[in-house]
Amino acid sequence: MSEQIAAVRRMVEAYNTGKTDDVADYIHPEYMNPGTLEFTSLRGPELFAINVAWVKKTFSEEARLEEVGIEERADWVRARLVLYGRHVGEMVGMAPTGRLFSGEQIHLLHFVDGKIHHHRDWPDYQGTYRQLGEPWPETEHRRP
């Protein structure tokens, strides 16, 4: 297994366990996920750790990612994952529904200096929203 694929699997393990004490080993100091730009200007391992905590807070401590497939090309890794969770925390203004859900995701990860630098992900928002019962937002959304 390549070092890049091993790093992506460590990323998945962090989301599954909530443990982020070693993320600087595989997350670049300038790591970014463009999906977070609306909420924060943070970068690097700190941003990644916040994202992991948000997933656990919003989708329960039992939330987990399952690897479906993983491929590598040069400085890029593409991971096909499924997120399983229960909606237990506020999400984009929607109160917790308590409902279980699962949703497929595609993650594209670019590596710089052997670490994950740029992370794009495309979750199945529509399918997840349906599984949550299509709740209406109750407040304006501001993710910390």
From Swiss-Prot:
Biological role: Involved in the biosynthesis of aklavinone which is an important precursor common to the formation of the clinically significant anthracyclines such as carminomycin, daunorubicin (daunomycin), rhodomycin, aclacinomycin T (aklavin) and aclacinomycin A (aclarubicin). These compounds are aromatic polyketide antibiotics that exhibit high cytotoxicity and are widely applied in the chemotherapy of a variety of cancers. Catalyzes the cyclization of aklanonic acid methyl ester to yield aklaviketone.
Protein name per Swiss-Prot or TrEMBL: Aklanonic acid methyl ester cyclase AcmA
Enzyme class: isomerase
Covalent S-S links between cysteines: none
Pfam hit, one: SnoaL
Keywords from the named record: Antibiotic biosynthesis, Isomerase
Effect of pH on activity: Optimum pH is 7.2.
EC number, UniProt record: 5.5.1.23
Annotated positions binding substrate: 51, 105
